[in-house]
Curated annotation (Swiss-Prot):
Binding sites annotated in the UniProt record for Mn(2+) 1: 252, 333, 378, 417
Name of the protein this chain belongs to: Xaa-Pro dipeptidase
One BP term from GO: proteolysis
Function: Splits dipeptides with a prolyl residue in the C-terminal position.
Keyword Nucleotide-binding assigned: no
Cited PANTHER family: XAA-PRO AMINOPEPTIDASE 3, XAA-PRO DIPEPTIDASE
Organism of provenance: Actinobacillus pleuropneumoniae serotype 5b (strain L20)
Note on cofactor: Binds 2 manganese ions per subunit.
GO cellular component, one term: cytosol
Class of enzymatic activity (EC top level): hydrolase
Amino acid sequence: MKQLFTQHIKRLQQVVQTILETNFLSGLWIHSGTARYHFLDDQTAPFKINPHFNYLFPFPTAENCWLFLDGKNKPTVYFYAPNDYWHTPPVAPTDAFFADEFQWVILQDSQEIAKFIQNPTACTFIGEDENLAESLGFNQINPQKVLNQFHFERSIKSEFEIEAIYQAQFAALKGHQAAKQAFFEGKSEFEINLAYLKASQQSDLNVPYGNIVAINQHSAILHYTQLDYAPNPQQQSFLIDAGATIHGYASDITRTYAADPNSEFAAMIKQMEQYKYRIIDQLTVGVNYLSYHTQMQQWIAEMLYEYDFVRLTPEQIFEEGISRAFLPHGLGHLLGLQVHDAAGFQQNPRGTRKSPPEVYPSLRCTRDLAENMVLTIEPGFYFIDMLLNPLQNSPLARHINWQKIAEFKQFGGIRTEDNIVMRSQGAENLTQKAEIELQLSDH
C-alpha cells in the first residue's frame, strides 16, 4: 500500500495546487472533526471523520486533527494526542505506511493549533465546525467552489483507493458467509447480525452503515435496521446488506437467500443474480449510468411477465411504469470514503448538477461512466405494500395477478449487490474477485 499511497498523495498534491491557484489561495486547512455531544448530555455519538481529511490522511480515527497543504511542500499533519485517563489516548501512526508523506506535529492541547495557523484570511478551511473556523480567523469556510473540485476528484479513484475498497470486500464477505450460516441454522436477526460482526471483526460502531439483516417481509423495507431478537419459526427468506471499511473506504455487499432452494422464489433470486452479472458485463466507459438503470427496469418487466405477476407484455409493463413499483431504487451509486460517495450527480469540477429523471427519483448517479469510477450494482425486486396499493386502485389493477403477489409478500424482496471499478475495457468486479480468492464464488 505504501507505493500506491505515494502515487495517491502525489496526485492530490497536484489537485490541491490547482485548487489553490484557481481560487487565489495560499493554503488549505482541513479539520478532521470531533465527536458530537447528544442534546443535553455528556455522551457523544460515535466519531465520524471528515471525508476530505480521510481522503488525504487514511486514518479514520484521527479525531480533532488538522492538515495543512500548500500543494508544493510536504503536507503537515497536526495530530491531536492528549494525555487522558478517561479514554484510550490516541497514538500517532508515525510508523504507518503513509507516515513518510507527512510532516508531523503532535498536539497535546487542541488549542495549540492557533499558533500554527498563519494568515488564515489567505487560506480556506474545510470541516464541519464552522464556529471553530471563524474563531481562528478564517473567512473562506467550506467554499462551494473548492468542495466541488474535491468532490469531482473523489469520484475518480486512485489505485490506492481501489485497493482499499478491494481489501474491504474480504471482511464483508467473511461476515456474509457467517450470516448465511446463522440464517440456515434458524437464528434470529439479532443473532445473525452478531455472527456477521464477529466474522468480519467489526462492531456496530465502525461498520460503514447500519447492517440490514432482514428475514421474510422485513426484506421489503429497503433500509431495515431494527433487528428482531427472537427467531422466526417460519423463516422463508433472508436479505443481508452489509459492508466493511479499510482505511476509511467502504465495501457495500448484498445477498438474498431462500429457505427452500427449490422454490420459485429461489429461482427468482438466481435470475436476479444473472441480471446483475449481465449488466456488469455490459458496463462501458462513456455510457451514462441512467441507460443501465433503464435496462434493468426493462429486465424487471420481463421477470414480472415470466413469473406471471403481471399479465401484460414486458414492453407494456415497462411503458406503464409498473416495474418501478417492484424496483423503486436506483441500480447503484458511487462508492468510496462515503457509502453513497460524492459527486454522483456532479458532471464536472465546476459543480454542474444533473438531477435524476422524474420517473427515477431515487437514482443516485447520473454520470457518464469514467475509468476508475467505483460503483455498486444492486438490482432489486420487492413486494412493498406502499407501492403496490396505488396500482391496486388504478386501471392497471386488472392486469396484475394479485393472488400470486399476496403469496409472495411473505418473502419481502430480493437484492443482490456487488462493487465494481470501471476500467478502459469494461467493469472489474471487485466483489466477485474477492469471492474467487476466498473460494466462495460459483459464477
